[in-house]
Amino acid sequence: SYAALRRGMSGDEDFHAIPRLSLAAAAGPGQFAGGEAPFDNFGFSGRWLRENGFDPKMLSALTVEGDSMEPLLRHGDEILVDRGSRFERDGVHVVRMGDALMVKRLASAGAGRIALLSQNLAYPPVEVSLDEVEVLGRVVWKSGRL
């Protein structure tokens, strides 16, 4: 009920301000990064962050641009990136290739290689050397319009 929801928002719980960065991670061919200055914050429950093992100092929010990760991530979705989680296992990550930031599903592709995979099958996989890409963090949460 609404009353129960309001009781859960009593202010007794700690919240952490997670910076929303003024750059986008492209779900497409790649977006040139502008700067990494926060323009706003998302408030996340400290309890939720602890339950999920997240360090608030290692989290940033970015906006998804493009359609290559649809239907998982849509253009305009906000994503939470755990910068403390590098590529240790397959999953959705934010990567930098040159000046471009991209959000892609990563998979091992043999010794010293990595595959950048789109959810949208209209985009073919891209295989690169680990030296060509910097894994900035793992996508751990998303928010978007219905």
PLM segments and residue spans:
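Glycine- and charge-enriched low-complexity intrinsically disordered segments
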Residues: 108-146
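Short, positionally conserved secondary-structure boundary motifs
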Residues: 1-75, 136, 141-146
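Short, surface-exposed secondary-structure edge patches
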Residues: 68-72, 82-86, 130
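Short coil-to-beta-strand transition motifs
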Residues: 96-102, 132-134
